[in-house]
A protein has these predicted regions:
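Active-site helix of classical SDR
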Residues: 42, 77
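Short, flexible catalytic-loop segment of classical short-chain dehydrogenase/reductase
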Residues: 102-113
Length: 167
C-alpha cells in the first residue's frame, strides 16, 4: 500500500425514481457505489493515513438533509455517507480527520442528461439563492482545503457547497 496523506473519495450517482418504482436492487447498487466502496477504500489506506496524520474527504448531496422529490435512493445512500463521516471522525481522531462535502446539482458529466433540457437546468439554477448551478471547482477547492493542514482543526463536518440551497 503506497504512503498517502489524504483521500478525496468523489463518487456519485443520480438515480432518480419515485418510491413506487424503487427496487431493493436500486438501493443495493447505490449503497455499494457510495458507501461500501468508500469503506473499503478507507480501510485499505487507514494505516498510512494514521501514520501521516491524514485527511479523508467524502461526498454527499444536499438532498440527504434537505429532501427532494424522487431522490430517495441517492439521499438515503448519501445520508449513510454522512453518518460514516461523523462516526469515523470520532473513531480516527486525533490522527485522521474526516469531513464530507454536500454539493447541490453541479455541472458535470453525470448531470448532463438532466441539464440538456435548458428549462430544467434554468429552473434548478433559480431554486438556488445564488441563481446558478455549481461547478466542479466549487467542491474541488473545498476538498483541497480539507485535505491540507490548513484545515487541521476541522473534522466531523458535513459542509454544504450548494449555492445556499440547504438553508
Amino acid at each position: 500500500v503506497p504512503e498517502i496523506k489524504g483521500i478525496a473519495y468523489c463518487v456519485g450517482s443520480i438515480d432518480l425514481k419515485p418510491l413506487r418504482m424503487i427496487t431493493e436492487q436500486d438501493f443495493n447498487k447505490c449503497m455499494k457505489l457510495n458507501l461500501y466502496s468508500a469503506v473499503e477504500a478507507i480501510k485499505g489506506y487507514q494505516e498510512s493515513l494514521k501514520k501521516n496524520n491524514g485527511s479523508i474527504v467524502l461526498f454527499s448531496t444536499v438532498a440527504a438533509q434537505r429532501g427532494f422529490t424522487n431522490h430517495t435512493i441517492i439521499a438515503s445512500a448519501k445520508a449513510a455517507v454522512e453518518g460514516l463521516t461523523v462516526s469515523l471522525a470520532a473513531e480516527f481522531a486525533p490522527n485522521i480527520r474526516v469531513n464530507c462535502i454536500a454539493p447541490s446539482l453541479t455541472k458535470s458529466k453525470i448531470a448532463e442528461p438532466m441539464l440538456k433540457n435548458t428549462t430544467i437546468a434554468e429552473g434548478i439554477a433559480k431554486a438556488h439563492p445564488l441563481k446558478r448551478l455549481g461547478e466542479g471547482k466549487d467542491s474541488a477547492s473545498l476538498a483541497k482545503f480539507l485535505i491540507t493542514e490548513d484545515s487541521s482543526w476541522v473534522t466531523g463536518q458535513i459542509i454544504a457547497v450548494d449555492g445556499g440551497r440547504s438553508k
